[in-house]
Amino acid sequence: MIADKALPSRLDDLNLAQSAVNPPQAQDIGVDRLVTDRDGTASDISVTVVPVESAEGHIRPYPKQWEQRTALRDGTAIFIRPLRPEDEPLYKPFFSAVTKQDVRLRFFGPVKEFDHAFLARFIQIDYITAMAFIALDEGTGRMLGVVRLHTNPDGVTGEYAILIRSDLKDRGLGWLLMKTMIDYAPTQGIRVIEGQVLRENSTMLTMCKELGFRVEPDPVDFSVCLVELRTDKF
């Protein structure tokens, strides 16, 4: 807390706004009102910091370092980047390019309407506990696919889900998104990536095996396979 709000001290050398979103996390700011120069600038400022992982209420900024430009097998240039809150308009055209069958395989059932309430669940993301990477066509800006990773409460396992446009299968897009997600997971302390895949989704199961996932039948639901990848193998 600031010791005296009325003190006309300048904190030019201390970027308080940035300290709210970037590590280290400012926990306490103290200003000694007795130690100031003639123009009222405080010269004795103390800041107590704690590591990001232990700072409650920490807001993680957009992770720009995870942006990448690459290409599909046919040479189509794509841009893979973390999801942003303003990306909702990209989703409706994207879902219109996904068949009902592929929607069912992704959500384990039909989706009647991709309205704002439905899409909001995907757009509102906390980078501390979840991540979503979207692939965009460099030429048109259209959304081509998305992979998500949610950290489980234990902090060391995470669950993934992926969906790409139905007309882009077998062009390497799913592989690129999965690899991006797999590379990202250990940087967040996730040691095991988990997922549930319908047994009939042979394309996804084949890719999981090629990526090194262990694939086993769900002991509770025979229609589902459980997939698991240990990130410490890489």
What are these model-predicted stretches?
Residues 2-3, 10-11, 39-234:
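Long, contiguous binding/interaction regions
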Residues 8-31, 36:
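N-terminal intrinsically disordered, low-complexity tails
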